[in-house]
Regions:
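Central regulatory/effector-binding core of bacterial HTH transcription factors
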Residues: 1-55
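Beta->alpha turn/N-cap motifs
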Residues: 30, 46-49, 68-70, 142-145, ...
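Flexible hinge/capping segments at coil-to-helix
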Residues: 53-93
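A local structural motif
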Residues: 21-25, 110-120
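Secondary-structure junction motif
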Residues: 89-109
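A late-sequence structural motif
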Residues: 161-201
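Hydrophobic hinge/microswitch elements
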Residues: 114-166, 177
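Short, well-ordered beta-strand core segments
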Residues: 41-43, 65, 90, 140
Length: 201
């Protein structure tokens, strides 16, 4: 849901302004939608293995990062290795027991580490985790797109940058639609708009 709220929703108003003959119904959900059974024109799914039987275009990589406020790091110190997270308050998703087991792979190396984190604030909403981190409640696991603005403003600092934070919610954001050679012009306009507004990077 976070991707739809924070990356897709802000693009709806400018798209509708540019395409007055097109309407958009946006359904934000974390479940896998069956486009055929549910008569859905287009889905956006974060995955490294897009389903066969659907056409698709990659939008962008969705990476998760760990970050904290400057005040928290000044008070508690900055972890240099994932194993040091056990000495910190961590803010995590908490929808599944595996959400508190943070996995890391060292960039350019084979080393992989899984750390069982704990913290006083657990919340299943990325914007709330971000705000909790800004308030100094701990080190948060966040999608990069959710943290970007706060990082640019200096409200958050990224930690453990030498490590990739591997989560079940990381991957490539894919636009998926029925494999019809001739997409309706209104759907094609939305697909092209999203692909240009969210360039691969």
């Amino acid at each position: 849901k976070a991707y739809g709220r924070q990356r897709i929703h802000p693009l709806v108003a400018p798209f509708l302004a540019a395409h007055p003959q097109v309407d958009v119904q946006l359904v934000v959900t974390d479940r896998v939608v069956d486009l055929f059974a549910e008569d859905v024109d287009l889905a956006i799914r974060i995955t490294d293995t897009p389903p066969t039987g659907l056409a698709g275009r990659p939008l962008e990589a969705v990476e998760h990062i760990v970050c904290a406020s400057p005040a928290y790091l000044a008070r508690r110190g900055t972890p240099q290795h994932p194993s040091e997270l056990t000495e910190h308050d961590c803010i995590y998703l908490g929808e599944d027991p595996s959400d508190r087991r943070w996995r890391f792979t060292q960039r350019g190396q084979a080393e992989s580490v899984t750390v069982a984190v704990r913290g006083r604030y657990v919340v299943n909403h990325s914007e709330m985790r971000r705000e909790g981190a800004i308030a100094g409640l701990g080190i948060a696991s966040l999608p990069g797109f959710a943290a970007q603005g706060a990082l640019e403003r200096g409200e958050l600092v990224r930690v453990l940058q030498a490590w990739r934070h591997d989560t079940a919610y990381s991957g490539t954001a894919w636009l998926l639609y029925p494999p019809n050679r001739f997409l309706p012009s209104r759907l094609r306009a939305w697909v092209d708009y999203l692909a240009s507004a969210i360039p691969q990077g």
